[in-house]
Amino acid sequence: MHGHNRNGQAHVPRRKRRNRFVKKNGQCNVYFANLSNKSQRYMADIFTTCVDTRWRYMLMLFSAAFLVSWLFFGLLFWCIAFFHGDLEASPSVPAAGAPGGNGGAAPAAPKPCIMHVNGFLGAFLFSVETQTTIGYGFRCVTEECPLAVIAVVVQSIVGCVIDSFMIGTIMAKMARPKKRAQTLLFSHHAVISVRDGKLCLMWRVGNLRKSHIVEAHVRAQLIKPYMTQEGEYLPLDQRDLNVGYDIGLDRIFLVSPIIIVHEIDEDSPLYGMGKEELESEDFEIVVILEGMVEATAMTTQARSSYLASEILWGHRFEPVVFEEKSHYKVDYSRFHKTYEVAGTPCCSARELQESKITVLPAPPPPRSAFCYENELALMSQEEEEMEEEAAAAAAVAAGLGLEAGPKEEAGIIRMLEFGSHLDLERMQGTLPLDNISYRRESAI
């Protein structure tokens, strides 16, 4: 039997845990080794590789791509200017009429391929200005070298390709619904208890955002080692747990937290498992919640898992939804809390069915262990009745011109109750007797 600590959490007996196949945060605990041509396969799907990689690596990759393209075309422009002779220092020709001049016209300087490029730094700056379309207007390509014109066109195309790829990758990485799963919540424990006379496995899911998950549906699989009849060992044999596929109960309207129910019947892998077997079993139940994000219409998936040690036998979840005057309130402080249910059978569902045991309602427990749903319902009903009586007393007091204090309201309430009893007696005196009773009296 599991006890409770001060925080309301159930104590789980310690025993050796198996390695999780799916972690509680949804990550798969799988490592791939000895993959042939891994780099080539990942580079063949470079877009998915960039989307799946971390932000820092992606930004480093695109920064390196820009820098390499600038350096490459800067070197290309420098080579064009070098072989055209634009980098050679032109001799200083004295102006006409200057001392030592011949008074004649100065020889015309050859027209360069790229204006104002006198070294590699100038060529690199021209490459950056061309690819980023800054357009300072100081350096430009002339008609002297067609090769330089072709290089400018090619660099413009390459720059557009890099920009488009970077923007598309960043947008796809930001819009993917992977982070939406962080606001979908699974309970820390699953429970097994009786519901409608049958043993059921239950866990709770919740949505922390007000935006809905469209077409939300759940799935569950039990994973455990399995030995076939031929002696083949399957370390991770997967078997489905029916959560209402046939009748549509797997599709949920996830506005408030919902308890997912798996009925342990003949087709369930848990059919022959009782409380003692559960404590010694080695399995993992993977639960999956899928749906479309309302804002982007993209499919998201949230995952979690429960080991055998995280399933509480004979427990139920505390309620989290409370009806108030104008709305419903969801208290997420109770989301993971459970309470023990007296009278839950410890046998398996098979034994329960074979022995034809009828699960009778347990005798009323003490106030401290009273069912939370019934207690809250009674408290809510009593509060509503008290509010109605107080409103009626205030109305009567206002009609009589009295100040309705606490004592006056109590007296008026007693008067109303006494008056209702008198009215009931008067009505009973004026009502005619039943004809059937007349005939029976005459027969007597």
UniProtKB/Swiss-Prot annotation:
Chief site of localization: membrane
GO CC, alphabetical: cytoplasmic vesicle membrane; monoatomic ion channel complex; postsynaptic membrane
Extracellular side: 81-119, 139-147
GO biological process: potassium ion import across plasma membrane; regulation of monoatomic ion transmembrane transport
Catalyzed reactions per annotation: K(+)(in) = K(+)(out)
Cytoplasmic side: 1-55, 170-444
Pfam families: IRK, IRK_C
Alphabetized UniProt keyword annotations: Cell membrane, Cytoplasmic vesicle, Ion channel, Ion transport, Membrane, Postsynaptic cell membrane, Potassium, Potassium transport, Synapse, Transmembrane, Transmembrane helix, Transport, Voltage-gated channel
Subcellular location: Cell membrane; Postsynaptic cell membrane; Cytoplasmic vesicle membrane
Annotated site location: Role in the control of polyamine-mediated channel gating and in the blocking by intracellular magnesium: D163
Membrane-topology descriptor: Multi-pass membrane protein
Annotated TM spans: 56-80, 148-169
Role according to the record: Inward rectifier potassium channels are characterized by a greater tendency to allow potassium to flow into the cell rather than out of it. Their voltage dependence is regulated by the concentration of extracellular potassium; as external potassium is raised, the voltage range of the channel opening shifts to more positive voltages. The inward rectification is mainly due to the blockage of outward current by internal magnesium. Can be blocked by extracellular barium and cesium.
This protein's name: Inward rectifier potassium channel 4
Chain ranges for the short sequence motif Selectivity filter as given in the UniProt record: 133-138
Entries under InterPro entries matching the protein: Ig_E-set (IPR014756), IRK_C (IPR041647), K_chnl_inward-rec_Kir (IPR016449), K_chnl_inward-rec_Kir2.3 (IPR003273), K_chnl_inward-rec_Kir_cyto (IPR013518), Kir_TM (IPR040445)
Parts of the chain in the membrane but not crossing it: 120-131, 132-138
GO MF annotation terms: inward rectifier potassium channel activity
Family listed: Belongs to the inward rectifier-type potassium channel (TC 1.A.2.1) family. KCNJ4 subfamily.
